Amino acid sequence: MEKLQYELQGYLEIDRYRKQRFLYPLLFREYIYALAHDHGLNSSIFYEPTENLGYDNDNKSSSLIVKRLITRLHQQNHLTISVNDSRFVGPNRSFYSQTIPEGFAGIMEIPFSVRLVSSLERERIAKYHNLRSIHSIFPFLEDKLSHLYYVSDILIPYPIHLEILLQTLRTRIRDAPSLHLLRCFLHEHHNWNSLITSNKSISIFSKENQRLFLFLYNSHVYECESVLVFLRKQSSHLRSISSLAFLERTHFYGKIKHLVVTPRNDSQRTLPLWFFKEPLMHYVRYQGKSIMASRCTNLLMKKWKYYLVNFWQCHFHLWSQPGRIHINELSNHSFYFLGYLSGVRLTPWVIRSQMLENSFMIDTAIKRFDTIVPIFPLIGSLVKAKFCNVSGYPISKSVWADSSDSDIIARFGWICRNLSHYHSGSSKKHSLCRIKYILRLSCARTLARKHKSTVRAICKRLGSKLLEEFLTEEHEIVSFIFRRTRLRSERIWYLDIIRIHGLVPHS
């Protein structure tokens, strides 16, 4: 694998590539498909193991099949392979339909990858692993939002046509043959599975070509945020690199001290003067949902709202309704983000002051960033996973009844520990206790269904073994640091969470 990466690096150093950005010949290199299959390209920075991304590992990479594939690519009159072609029907059909887009996605990522590495080296941004954690967002919000007044909850619109995705890539990739081949892939896939419809978000991809469409969606979101580039250049920022796709990252925009307007050739993209009256703007995003907060007035936030809507409609032909951007006052509103209901709460305090022989009481209020876990979205996720009914009553997981007892307990315990680990930042743990109760009782009902017994008999037979599996090691360690009474209200953020659990409703 190191030899393949060394050969690829040698190709990237060719002057012709630097001048013309000619990527199309890479499609005929065997090592590209090997790198794409096991995600060797930039795997240490950007990607999780293959099994975590939902790829089918049964189709092993075959050098002979790849050589035949490249030979047929050379023989094609058009720059695409039809899935209905009789030469590709058979046991290797799924391999062809998956390998070509995966290899092509790896090729398309090369210019962005080189640009990202060079920018990290130029700006001397340290690659701290704890910045990859999703929980690293919340300490930033806790530090900043308590001083702000308004928050804007934004849903980034998804493209309504495949051609829009290609138009956004033209400014980044100057290789016409590669873009033409990508257009063929998109139209073929659009005809196969009707990928993008008015009822489904583009973020829901088929597992076959997940890497390619994740790349396209992330490049689309990156372009939608281009209006905020001027904030990024003039702000102190902190990057959290997501391991799912390298363009999907979370930017932390800190306080802006000096803001300079950069002239642009396109007069329509010139930012209005009212943008710079209040430079204190904070922005954070995860996938297609972003939060923008500021100390500015409600009128200025509304101007931001309509500017974003018009910007997306005029320059990206995206139909973004103003109702997708909600503006609320932080002191009276909580916003849902990454599975937490976050807001700023006023905590009353009574301070006793004494001056000489006179003493008096002072009533004051302190703003505090508060995060809680809403119970109903979590129960809704458990209902979809068939752990309980709509009323929150635990039911047995019938599809797991054929597994061994230890396997069933381990599965339920793993889910419970992960949910507790992710929601450890909640200031109120009552909802988590209810989720743990549902999972424990669902586990007991599953075991009772398997052995045709009762829940009481199962709990009596297993005893403490059933309870110990649902306790986390972190809970035992933290209990030594904080007292039990304080632990119920203490927020704990872990810096090792790089992905959201499937049961966490974050959209």
UniProtKB/Swiss-Prot annotation:
One Pfam family per UniProt: MatK_N
Localization in the cell: Plastid, Chloroplast
Disulfide bonds: none
GO molecular function per UniProt: RNA binding
Listed GO biological process terms: mRNA processing; RNA splicing; tRNA processing
Signal peptide annotation: none
Highest taxon of the lineage: Eukaryota
Record key words, sorted: Chloroplast, mRNA processing, Plastid, RNA-binding, tRNA processing
GO cellular component: chloroplast
Xref: PANTHER family: MATURASE K
Function comment: Usually encoded in the trnK tRNA gene intron. Probably assists in splicing its own and other chloroplast group II introns.
Protein family per UniProt: Belongs to the intron maturase 2 family. MatK subfamily.
Protein name: Maturase K
Species, as recorded: Nymphaea alba (White water-lily)
